[in-house]
Amino acid sequence: HDNLTLSVTLKSDASIRNQVVASVAKALKCSPAFPEDYESLKKAFRNPKLQMVSFTITEKGYATAPKYVQDDIPKGPEKCSTVICMVTALALERFKAGAFPFAFVSMDNCSHNGEKLQKGVMEVANAWKKLGFVDDGFIEYLSNPEKVSFPWSMIDKITPRPDGGVAKMLSSLGFEDTEVVVTGKNTWIAPFVNSEECEYLVIEDSFPNGRPRLEESGIYMTDRDT
């Protein structure tokens, strides 16, 4: 779908607003199994101008306790395949390129999300240090909030899985290819997203390399205490 998504907002007055979301410039597979895509991501992380990397990978994505993550850690930064290991490997790329500052921003709807992301990254990095893959300098880089920050955020927007009724409504309007697909992992995907009207996103304003003007998009920027 050319990285386009149709946002279907179900409003409180029973009306519906359809809007094409065209903010995704490019989609890449974050995995060494796809070397061309992965090299593009490495290049992005080596860019001194990179300001933030955001996450919506669910709370489970930050965990290091599962066996598949524990089995992945000893493979090291060059051969790992789990999300938390790969993002740590990409941070290592940035460290090696010049230890440039940036922010890792979790936008998953869970309490202390930035802390969970930081914990996962640090656990992987410390394990790699014990295994000889990284040195103290990398640990110090990740531990310095003036270099790498892990802002907390809070989001509220009910976005249920794609609804068959919405798909039929879109088809009646002439919108093509509305099929809802259920993957082998029971993930529901579709070329549209149906959601409620009420929404907000609050982010801790901790960005060591600067940030886009997020407040101009309606995002609330504040400190952690607030």
Whereabouts are the PLM-identified features?
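Substrate/ligand-engaging "lid" and interaction regions
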Residues: H1-T226
